């Protein structure tokens, strides 16, 4: 016991074999899902959540809709969180569905982490903007803003300008395609005075501004790398 196995060879030489004590295990390789699969699944899940919320709202007699953004009211600040999840009716939600799917999917192509941060910035900043200016132009008193269209306008604005900030060909192409297909809806962010109810241009405008802010903030790594590259080129010494 405790002896090392040995095998004699000619000439008296001894070969010692030492057990490693570590059993060999087969190597496992995790397969990373393509970005478009992750993005598509994420957006489909989010839109499915919106339909579930609307179903609950309809079954409750539209009681959830009172949780929208009520401008300049302290309790209306809760709407900043809940408003993008609420819709006035099925028609309202279905009108937002295709833009949510298309623009949301394109947003995820920049990376899921960047998509989450951009959405959070647009969601909160756009909601706060709506809370501040939501009553501007209303001819029938205080308003209550609900719907995911502010998020749509934020994603749209983000996609339009993000490529310009990062100076990457693929992102610029996406921005141009989005401009060609959805550029016309930006008219929905134009102020309309003397309006009673209807489309929330205040939410659209606030969402679009928040989208530009998000694109600028989240393009910081690329902009910083570009600035360092320019600085390095200027400070380079000529070769002798």
From Swiss-Prot:
Q: Where is the region Disordered?
A: 1-32
Q: Which domain of life is it from?
A: Bacteria
Which keywords does this chain's UniProt record carry?
A: Cell membrane, Membrane, Transmembrane, Transmembrane helix
What protein family does this chain belong to?
Answer: To M.leprae ML1171.
Molecular function (GO) terms for this protein are: serine-type endopeptidase activity
What do the Gene Ontology cellular component annotations say? plasma membrane
Q: Where is the composition biased (Basic residues)?
A: 1-11
Species this protein is from? Mycobacterium bovis (strain ATCC BAA-935 / AF2122/97)
Indicate yes or no for the key word S-adenosyl-L-methionine.
no
The answer to whether UniProt assigns keyword Oxidoreductase to this entry is: no
Which InterPro entries does the protein's record reference? Peptidase_S54_rhomboid_dom (IPR022764), Rhomboid-like_sf (IPR035952)
Regions that span the bilayer: 36-56, 93-113, 115-135, 146-166, 172-192, 198-218
Specify the protein's topology with respect to the membrane: Multi-pass membrane protein
Its annotated compartments are: Cell membrane
Name of the protein this chain belongs to = Uncharacterized protein Mb1372
């Amino acid at each position: 016991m405790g002896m090392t196995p040995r095998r004699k060879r000619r000439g008296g030489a001894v070969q010692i074999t030492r057990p490693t004590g570590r059993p060999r295990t087969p190597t496992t390789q995790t397969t990373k899902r393509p970005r478009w699969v992750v993005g598509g699944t994420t957006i489909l899940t989010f839109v499915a959540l919106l339909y579930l919320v609307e179903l609950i709202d309809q079954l409750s007699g539209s009681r959830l809709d009172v949780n929208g953004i009520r401008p300049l009211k302290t309790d209306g600040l809760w709407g900043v969180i809940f408003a993008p999840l609420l819709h006035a009716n099925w028609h309202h939600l279905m009108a937002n569905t295709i833009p949510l799917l298309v623009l949301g999917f394109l947003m995820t192509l920049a990376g899921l982490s960047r998509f989450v941060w951009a959405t959070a910035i647009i969601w909160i900043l756009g909601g706060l903007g709506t809370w501040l200016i939501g009553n501007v132009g209303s001819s029938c008193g205080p308003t209550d803003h609900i719907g995911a269209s502010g998020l749509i306008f934020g994603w749209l604005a983000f996609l339009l300008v993000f490529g310009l900030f990062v100076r990457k060909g693929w992102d610029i192409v996406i921005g141009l395609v989005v401009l060609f297909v959805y550029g016309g809806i930006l008219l929905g962010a134009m102020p309309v005075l003397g309006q009673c109810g209807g489309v929330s241009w205040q939410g659209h405008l606030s969402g679009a501004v928040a989208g530009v802010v998000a694109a600028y903030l989240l393009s910081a790594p690329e902009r910083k790398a570009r600035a360092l590259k320019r600085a390095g080129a200027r400070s380079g010494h000529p070769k002798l």
